Amino acid sequence: MQCALYDAGRCRSCQWITQPIPEQLSAKTADLKNLLADFPVEEWCAPVSGPEQGFRNKAKMVVSGSVEKTLLGMLHRDGTPEDLCDCPLYPASFAPVFAALKPFIARAGLTPYNVARKRGELKYILLTESQSDGGMMLRFVLRSDTKLAQLRKALPWLHEQLPQLKVITVNIQPVHMAIMEGETEIYLTEQQALAERFNDVPLWIRPQSFFQTNPAVASQLYATARDWVRQLPVKHMWDLFCGVGGFGLHCATPDMQLTGIEIAPEAIACAKQSAAELGLTRLQFQALDSTQFATAQGEVPELVLVNPPRRGIGKPLCDYLSTMAPRFIIYSSCNAQTMAKDIRELPGYRIERVQLFDMFPHTAHYEVLTLLVKQ
């Protein structure tokens, strides 16, 4: 991938950009095999990759500069701002949005937040695009609601320029810390969720719900999990750390009982909406802590699917699963180091299948799907 920002030394986020994709995949596979070297693996499936540029469905832009000359991008460690509107990881459809947002910020009088001075209002612009219909969700992260009336007043102009903006919100993040969003979300549009579709499964994206940033590879990840589950004798499963329900909604069949658990209420609202659309009445999604939910249960289903954050599922949940011994565990991980650590805490299981998903090209990061079977 060619990147003018990298070539000019202005951005180093894609540290592996000079390596061809096959070399990147080889290095990631070697890393994964090294992490799982202590465990016999029955089958190594071929790694899955997608486009090497234009693949991201989300932009998280730090807003800096001035009202008249706004920069959207990032801050270097020394506080120097860098405009990343030309980042080749973003699809071409993002460019006109960034171009319209800069004059809109001036029209609405949204002073960019100055980290050094702790002054200003507009901290971040968060943009998400649906692959299914091209609709977009735009979130303005503000320090306070002081400029809210001005923003609302200027909004018709933005809608006129960008009719693809289906969901627009203001998020209030009042603290002087590098935190992307606060708890308060104010909707400026009637529509509150962005419609997405992977493999004919309807998914919904709401402002404060996690959603994969590489749709091409994520859809293959979900489809693979579905194919693995269909090969197993499973009538009842848990989907822990389920997010908007991507895994569970793909894996469920009309006669299967499934419980999806996720701590974020916004994500659970999305999952419930999808299940209703699919007419799957035996799916139950609850906004709870996954570990607390699981360890409080006196029995387990045949299959437990886990998709934890980078920290992994942790020892308490590993101990519970070891004791309760579901027949199958499918572990989807964005951090193979913590996954390997967790598998060490599940001594009664063998690894039947492993597959790497290159969700983050040009970096050392990757996702991995692992099927564990009770010995």
From Swiss-Prot:
Keyword Ligase included in the entry's annotation: no
A molecular function (GO) term: rRNA (uridine-C5-)-methyltransferase activity
GO terms of biological process kind: rRNA base methylation
PROSITE patterns, per the entry: SAM_MT_RNA_M5U (PS51687), TRMA_1 (PS01230), TRMA_2 (PS01231)
Keywords: 4Fe-4S, Iron, Iron-sulfur, Metal-binding, Methyltransferase, rRNA processing, S-adenosyl-L-methionine, Transferase
EC number in record: 2.1.1.189
Binding site for [4Fe-4S] cluster: 3, 11, 14, 87
Active site: 334
Role noted for this protein: Catalyzes the formation of 5-methyl-uridine at position 747 (m5U747) in 23S rRNA.
PANTHER family, per database record: RNA M5U METHYLTRANSFERASE (PTHR11061), TRNA (URACIL(54)-C(5))-METHYLTRANSFERASE (PTHR11061:SF30)
Family: Belongs to the class I-like SAM-binding methyltransferase superfamily. RNA M5U methyltransferase family. RlmC subfamily.
Protein name per UniProt: 23S rRNA (uracil(747)-C(5))-methyltransferase RlmC
